UniProtKB/Swiss-Prot annotation:
Gene Ontology cellular-component terms listed: mitochondrion
Subunit structure: Interacts with unneddylated cullin CDC53.
Further comment found in the protein's record: Present with 195 molecules/cell in log phase SD medium.
Disordered: annotated segments: 339-364
Taxonomic lineage of the native organism: Eukaryota, Fungi, Dikarya, Ascomycota, Saccharomycotina
Name of the protein: Cullin-associated NEDD8-dissociated protein 1 homolog
The species this protein was found in: Saccharomyces cerevisiae (strain ATCC 204508 / S288c)
Result, substituting K16R: Does not affect interaction with CDC53
Length: 660
């Protein structure tokens, strides 16, 4: 033990003055060696304070500031970036002491939470936490967590005390998982999955705790634990966990929708669709939970896969989903109609009562009541309070039902905006009826009734001069779409053998059409058509390579670099690109652009890949996981290996690995 740490511990132990203790703990600790200085400081000073100290100011100082700040300062040191010591010297001793000193367990686990929270709130840190040591400690923590849960139940603590005790464990476990598995960019959550027994325990604890909560909804802290755990779950394990999940749990974790791809059709068939049809409707669960799950899963029926241009959900499942939701919407419409009629009827009754004999100002009635009171009758029998309270209860219940109906209606309409319901007259009529009862955003209705176009447009027309077309689009003049598209299709065709200057001029025209002039009303399909025309020109064209010779010196000059740079720059400006276009773009970039001999072109290609993957990675592994692995990732990997190219993209955005 170093001299200054030894002296500090001795000074603290030798004084009874709390002010002096506080000052000693407030000083900046300069730790140079983990084993020789940090370990004795924690074990011989800070842990004893947490276990023995009676002064709350000193206790809170160590728990919320001294220990968390000390750990953070150590992590910031590159020499201590391998963080096995955080578990062995900080977390494990805190947990062990909580098991020994039950009366201080809350303070000790709270301190563990504070340490991990301090690390999480400093995202700039660059560190690596060994997975094996984490898994061992996580298992130990869960065992203690379950034991504590049993002890709390046995002690029959008040609800608020029991809740705070369990929440601190739940929050700590969530932070522990994030610290262990989200710390290293080289090991993202898609590559690291928790063992099934740990996952099963986590979900069981979360659901058991939520079941004791008087509120039906899952609290935010428990929800965070469920979301973190789902991110660390392999789809194969999710398939085993789903049958045990309650609907409110599934509603929470379905926000990590991209993990459910391999099992989503079965999930709709077994768990979701039955709830949408009578007589099962609403009997076994909260309908709002099911609607939330369906909405969270909307990419599975709203986005077409790259490999076959079809949604991941089967046609029959989507058809049943439409039918079930339409039936629910019809029932909700009837309920809203009844509510509206009752409100109108109630309003009429109020108007009639003002003209009748029920007036509070009727002198004969008041005289009669006064006489009853004077004869000893209980005036409370006639004051109407009980009837008013019953009426208020009924009104509150009706208002709650109406609010629930409106919430469910809006959620169903949101789902239909992703479903692209077929243009059926009965659906349009139902929307018109609903608009008379509740406020519905017109843009939402437009989206619901819009037709989904998947076919690429065809253009027939004459071929015009490119310079003339460029002047036309630059001047924002009325555009002859057919002429422009036919001309570009001709000039950009590989078979046409266009000169380099013609190709560059074509790219400039497209740049004005898609980027610089947004008033040309280019549809999504037309944009895709133009992109398909330019992508083949990302491959180096040998006819644009000139060879210069001067004596024995030979130099090759690639005149096509400018063209390829223009194309990649255009694609970057069009970002975010439509998902449907990635099936053409990603393999082309992986096969040609990343291996381009020009470093500028190569750099632009990696910029584009980085943007695409950061935006669409969850969609690619959630909907197109097989295509992503076979048609893009392996192509990129082979290109990088063959050309000895280093990129972090292969580590940051891996495909799903086979499950053990």
């Amino acid at each position: 033990m170093s001299l200054h740490i030894s002296k500090l511990i001795e000074q603290y132990r030798s004084t009874k003055d709390n002010d002096l203790k506080y000052m000693l703990l407030r000083q900046n600790f300069k730790i140079n060696d983990i084993e020789d200085e940090l370990a004795p400081l924690v074990n011989e000073l800070l842990l004893p304070v947490l276990v023995e100290e009676q002064d709350m100011e000193i206790l809170n100082l160590v728990s919320f500031q001294v220990l968390p700040d000390l750990v953070l300062s150590m992590i910031s040191d590159p020499a201590a970036a391998q963080l096995g010591w955080v578990i062995s010297l900080i977390c494990d001793p805190l947990l062990n002491q909580s098991m020994i000193h039950a009366n201080r367990s809350f303070v000790l686990i709270e301190t563990l939470r504070n340490v991990l929270q301090k690390i999480e709130n400093s995202p700039h840190l660059d560190y690596h936490q060994p997975v094996n040591s984490s898994l061992e400690f996580i298992s130990k923590f869960i065992v203690e967590m379950k034991r504590h849960m049993c002890d709390v139940d046995a002690a029959q603590l008040s609800h608020s005390l029991s809740e705070s005790n369990m929440l601190i464990y739940i929050e700590s476990l969530n932070l522990l998982l994030k610290f262990s598995f989200f710390s290293d960019a080289a090991s993202p959550s898609v590559m690291v999955t928790l063992p099934f027994d740990i996952l099963n325990d986590v979900f069981t604890i979360a659901q058991d705790y939520s079941a004791t909560n008087t509120n039906e909804s899952i609290d935010r802290i428990t929800e965070k634990l469920l979301l973190t755990s789902t991110q660390l779950t392999h789809p194969v394990d999710l398939e085993n966990l789903c049958p045990k999940m309650k609907y409110n749990t599934l509603a929470a974790v379905s926000r990590i929708w991209y993990k459910f791809g391999p099992i989503v059709d079965k999930l709709f068939t077994n768990r979701l669709l039955p709830v949408l049809f009578p007589p099962q409707m609403g009997e076994e669960c909260n309908v709002e939970d099911v609607l939330e799950i369906v909405h969270n899963f909307h990419p599975y029926f709203s986005i077409r896969r790259l490999k076959d241009n079809r949604p991941l959900l089967s046609d029959s499942t989507i058809s049943q989903l439409r039918e079930g939701l339409f039936g629910m919407l019809s029932i909700l419409n009837d309920s809203l109609t009844r509510t509206q009629n009752e409100n109108d009827h109630g309003s009429d009754n109020l108007i009639d009562s003002d003209d009748g004999f029920g007036s509070d100002n009727d002198p004969e009635q008041q005289a009669y009541l006064d006489e009853l009171v004077s004869e000893g009758y209980d005036e409370n029998m006639y004051d109407g309070d009980t009837d008013d309270e019953d009426a208020d209860d009924i009104n509150v219940e009706k208002n709650d039902e109406a609010t629930k109906d409106i919430t469910e209606t809006n959620k169903i309409l949101l789902i239909f905006s992703e479903l692209h319901y077929p243009q059926e007259e009965r659906f349009s009529e139902l929307l018109v009826e609903l608009q008379t009862k509740i406020a519905i955003n017109t843009s939402l209705i437009d989206k619901i009734l819009s037709k989904e176009t998947t076919e690429l447009p065809t253009h027939n027309g004459e071929i015009a001069d490119l310079n003339e077309i460029l002047n036309e689009v630059k001047g924002n003049k009325p555009i002859r779409k057919n002429v422009i598209f036919c001309t570009l299709a001709h000039t950009l065709s590989l078979q046409s053998g266009s000169e380099l200057s013609v190709l560059q001029l074509s790219i400039e025209v497209i740049d004005h059409l898609l980027v610089k002039n947004h008033s040309n009303n280019i549809t999504r399909g037309e944009q895709f058509q133009l992109i398909k025309l330019i992508l083949p020109h990302l491959k180096t064209n040998k006819s644009f390579i000139d060879t210069l010779k001067a004596g024995n010196f030979t130099q090759k000059i690639d005149e096509g670099v400018t063209l390829r740079t223009m194309i990649l720059s255009l694609l970057l400006q069009l970002f975010p690109l439509d998902y449907s276009m990635l099936g053409e773009i990603l393999p082309t970039i992986a096969r040609y652009s990343v291996r381009d001999k020009d470093l500028g072109v190569r750099d632009l290609s990696f910029q584009l890949l980085d943007q695409i993957l950061r935006t669409y990675y969850n969609y690619l592994i959630g909907i197109d996981w097989e295509w992503y692995k076979d048609d893009f990732y392996q192509v990129l990997q082979e290109t990088c290996i063959k050309k000895d190219i280093n990129t972090n993209l292969l580590l940051q955005f891996p495909p799903y690995l086979p499950h053990d």
